[in-house]
Design a protein with these regions (language model features):
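Bilobed "Venus flytrap"/periplasmic-binding protein-like clamshell domains
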Residues: 30-65, 132-199
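Bacterial N-terminal signal peptides
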Residues: 9-18
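Extracytoplasmic
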Residues: 28-30, 70-72, 82-85, 92-95, ...
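Bacterial N-terminal signal peptides that target proteins for export
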Residues: 1-10
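Pocket-flanking alpha-helical
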Residues: 63-118, 191-196, 211-220, 238-239
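Pocket-lining segment of extracytoplasmic ligand-binding domains
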Residues: 102, 113, 179-266
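Sec/Tat signal peptide C-region and signal peptidase I cleavage site
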Residues: 19-25
Length: 266
């Protein structure tokens, strides 16, 4: 039953022993939310949640133009390298809470997958499941990359090793008979990744985010792009092996000039 909780969604997590946050003068409380890179979805969503739950001393009353948050709480969204970084920061006590992909949360809780060899984080708890995150494999429209297998020998940004995107990119390559050694892997994030693609420094980039995500919206408005399908036997193998992946399309028109594409979500 618990495993079913980790199906295809972004989660906000905390450690059961650390929910209260840091206090000052026994009244003012601080609560941090680990998010992701500022160019992607996590950071603005984290900022909205932080604003909604904050209610500093002296705030106007709820319903009278003031905050309806937790009295004397100041919450803040903190940029990070993403899901893996957030989970590790929560476990270590560096942050009070954070966003994590469902697969990363499951692996942390069970001490398996990318967290194999680490103590299972049994005190890790889910506050809410927020939304599905779709794997975007982005290339320039003029490129000859039309499937995951076409990435062989190409320059591909997998994102930073501390991110959930990096983990998922490796799994997608593996489910299509490739490994990181089959591509010229780069560890670029956010605007650095989209700029590298636009300027021809890389051939494709992986992005895991709710759609539409700002970095790709901006890229599509500047240059013709395509979303490369993640489907067929590779997607079936991935979703069969890992229950937290599901096949889910990104609709036509989500990004300028880009038709509907079949991909997977987590």
């Amino acid at each position: 039953m618990f495993k079913n909780l980790f199906k295809s969604s972004l989660m906000i997590l905390f450690l059961m022993i650390g929910l209260s946050g840091k206090s000052f003068a026994q009244e003012l409380k601080f609560f941090t939310i680990g998010t992701g890179g500022t160019a992607y979805t996590y950071y603005p969503v984290g900022g909205m949640i932080a604003n909604a739950i904050s209610k500093p001393p002296g705030s106007r009353e709820c319903g009278k133009g003031g905050s309806c948050g937790v009295p004397n709480l100041i919450a803040s969204a903190v940029s990070s390298r993403g899901s893996v970084d957030n989970v590790n920061a929560i476990i270590s006590g560096l942050r009070n809470s954070g966003f994590a992909q469902s697969d990363v949360a499951y692996w942390a809780y069970t001490g398996t997958g990318t967290m194999e060899g680490k103590e299972p984080a049994k005190d890790l708890r889910t506050i809410a499941a927020l939304f599905q995150e779709h794997i975007h494999l982005v290339a320039l429209k003029k490129s000859n990359i039309n499937s995951v297998k076409d990435l062989k020998g190409k320059r591909v940004s997998l994102d930073e090793p501390g991110s959930g995107t990096y983990v998922d990119a490796k799994l997608i390559l593996e489910s299509n008979g490739l490994s990181t050694s089959d591509v010229k892997a780069e560890a670029l994030k956010g605007k650095a990744a989209t700029d590298a693609l636009r300027n021809g420094k890389v051939d494709a980039i992986f992005v895991v985010a709710g759609y539409p995500t700002g970095a790709i919206v901006e890229l599509a408005s500047a240059v013709d792009i395509k979303l490369v399908p993640i489907d067929g036997a590779g997607a079936k193998a991935l979703t069969s092996k890992y229950g937290f992946f599901s096949e889910s399309p990104i609709p036509s028109g989500t990004y300028e000039g880009v038709d509907q594409v079949n991909t997977v979500a987590v």
